[in-house]
């Protein structure tokens, strides 16, 4: 599944993205973020991070620098969420 998602994102970046107007409000772009997240965390957790990022990419969000979290940062976020439940 991970490999398939990576192939689809690379296809999008190479063939679809160049013909669309630049609209991503973030750096790295949402497709680059998704690729890095899936490579780092796998299809499920990386996919969730990618979806959350894409949902934040809209005209009412100022955007800016938003890198994929490190494994340590991601683990801290997961632990905080579990404590708050």
UniProtKB/Swiss-Prot annotation:
Coiled coil: none annotated. Disulfide bonds: none annotated. Keywords: Cell inner membrane, Cell membrane, Membrane. It is found in: Cell inner membrane. It is a peripheral membrane protein. Could be involved in insertion of integral membrane proteins into the membrane. Belongs to the UPF0161 family. This is Putative membrane protein insertion efficiency factor.
